[in-house]
Structures are given as C-alpha cells and as structure tokens.
Regions:
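A positional/architectural concept
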Residues: 1-56
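Charge/polar-rich, low-complexity and marginally structured segments
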Residues: 49, 54-183
Length: 183
C-alpha cells in the first residue's frame, strides 16, 4: 500500500506523486482510489486494490539510478530488423514498467535515430520512453527535468561515440571492415 506523498511510477506514464487517496462511488460501488499527480499536471485515478497488478511501484533509489546510467552507457542490444516486430518488442518493454527495460528502449532507439533515422511511430515511442525514464530519474536523483535530460543525452552520446567507429559513415566502416583493400 502506498501513502499520500509517495513517489511512484505508473507504467507507460512515468513517475509522479500520490496526491490523495479517495473513496469514489462509481456505478453504485464504493471504491478506494489513489489520485496520482503525473508530469504535465495530469491526474490519474488508480483503484488501490489493483495498483500492484497494474504495475504501480515505488520509484528507484540512487543505486538503481546508477544501474540505469550504466545501461545508457552500453552498446545497443540486438533488435529486429522488422519495424513492426521491433515496435511490438519495444512496446512490451515499456508496458512492463521496468525502468531498465525502458532505458534499453531509449538507448536502442537513440542509436537507431543517429544511424539512419526513425519512423514517425518510433520517434514518438522514443520521446515517450525518454519522458518516462527522465521523470523517474528526476525524482530518484532530486534534480531538474532539464538537468536529467541532459545527463541522459550525454550518456547516450558518449556510448554512441564509443561503440561506433565513425558516426558520420557507418556504411563506410562496414565496407572497410569486410572488404580489405590491397595496396
């Protein structure tokens, strides 16, 4: 059970605060609800008895935030070449509410965006995943949204440079790697 003032994460929406716990009469049935204050002044009502099943959880601590940062600093994990399958796989990771899975989506889609661009759907997914990730890290690290967004971007940029030989021309790197030129 959560209390008023607790920082929580609601899958697919990000981190927020429990603003209140209220009883509502819906269709003649009294039900207790958490009133969640989410980013962008959005309020969400979640039945208290279904919160855990829905995936509402406490925010991560500082040591878990460090693990998130280390995921952002790794090379991308293998993703399907098929856009549709990749999209479904990433959506499942985001729906899980697991911040490490969300960090994986942010890093992988950021790499793909830098290498060859993203479709409109994947751009939207990247923006949503990044908002979810940053909103939780802001509360875990007690920092501003802008500061945390810069940290996330910098970690991804550093890892991209580290794991990609020449970010200007990945195709040239592949050709040079596999086709030796005799001098």
């Amino acid at each position: 059970m959560f209390n008023v003032g607790d920082f929580i994460v609601y899958p697919m929406h990000g981190a927020g605060t429990i603003d209140a716990i209220e009883e509502k009469d819906i269709l003649g049935e009294k039900q207790s609800y958490y009133i969640l204050k989410m980013p962008g002044e959005v309020k969400v009502m979640v039945p208290t008895d279904k919160a855990e099943k829905i995936g509402v959880r406490n925010i991560i601590d500082k040591s878990s935030a460090e693990k998130v940062f280390s995921i952002l600093e790794e090379d991308e994990t293998e993703m399907s070449m098929n856009w549709n399958k990749r999209y479904r796989d990433n959506m499942e990771k985001m729906k899980s509410g697991d911040i490490y899975e969300v960090a994986d989506v942010v890093r992988n889609l950021s790499f793909k965006q830098k290498e060859k661009g993203l479709s409109t759907g994947e751009k939207k997914m990247l923006n949503n995943a990044k908002q979810i990730l940053v909103s939780e890290l802001v509360l875990a690290e007690r920092s501003s949204y802008e500061e945390m967004e810069n940290i996330v971007d910098n970690k991804i940029n550093q890892s991209f440079k580290e794991f990609r030989i020449d970010e200007e021309s990945p195709l040239t790197n592949m050709v040079n790697k596999f086709i030796p030129f005799n001098e």
